[in-house]
Amino acid sequence: MLSSARARLPISLCSFSLPFARLPNTLSRYQETWQRLPGRTHPTRSIRTTPAYEGHIPLNWFENAVLAVGSAFMSLADPRRGDMVAALGETTAGPTLPSLRDRMLDSIEGRRVLMQRPRVNSSTIDLNKLAHYPEGTFGRAYVTWLERCGVTPDTREPVHYIDDPELAYVMQRYRECHDFYHCICNLPVNVESELALKYFEFANLGLPMTLLSALVGPVRLTPQKRQRLFAEFVPWALKCGGSSRSLITVYWEERWGQNVADMKTEFGIWDPPEARWSKPLSEAKAAAERHRTAQTH
């Protein structure tokens, strides 16, 4: 959730990036105009020119490259632009998504995810029900994490620029399960913790966007926080992420009632160095309990 923090970058970079802000709409208009040119009978894209799924925006290689560069500048200039961060992830995914899909196919649990294609949002997850799960279960831990961080499961951008519907779902699944990674790794939502998780995700999944974010993001930290990131969090992230189970293969929704400690042991995950939380755990648990009691009555 790097997008929740404000970038501290020179005004010149922000100004240079402004023309890229409307790239998706510009590219869509370009495609429509190009297709209407007289004598234009063959497609402008080598694979497909019609949407393959709802929300799909087909791009040819040139458009993909332009959007990748533009979204990189916009993401750096204003990390709050979640649409640009998402576009960067999609346009730079390359061969990583087929590799992640293959990992899922090699896993019984991952194959069920691909077959059933569950979605993660407040319409598909009964947060009130999870709040009634016993203490120590993943479902209860997830609700407490949401309360502690002040976030919801409804903030993820839909996929637009990946042609293959199955690979588009793999990207969407990664995006929507990102908060589960925060929860299982016991990391809050702040810049240094998000960067630590990006290093973890790169070691675990190999998505190029996670490495780009991990390399560029530290410029927004104070020298003290940057020193701690590289001295404590990055070694944990690379070692733990690289040796643990590939989290893209986990069917999280089937594990609400499982003990979190048992899940960590199964996945090969251990806690990172102690992170800085904006809300104490006791306060978050009390708030979650009040919410649960209110729903009961």
From Swiss-Prot:
Membrane topology: Peripheral membrane protein
Family per record: Belongs to the COQ4 family.
UniProt keyword terms in alphabetical order: Lyase, Membrane, Metal-binding, Mitochondrion, Mitochondrion inner membrane, Transit peptide, Ubiquinone biosynthesis, Zinc
Transit peptide: 1-54
The protein's name: Ubiquinone biosynthesis protein COQ4, mitochondrial
Organism of origin: Laccaria bicolor (strain S238N-H82 / ATCC MYA-4686)
A Pfam match: Coq4
Job description of the protein: Lyase that catalyzes the C1-decarboxylation of 4-hydroxy-3-methoxy-5-(all-trans-polyprenyl)benzoic acid into 2-methoxy-6-(all-trans-polyprenyl)phenol during ubiquinone biosynthesis.
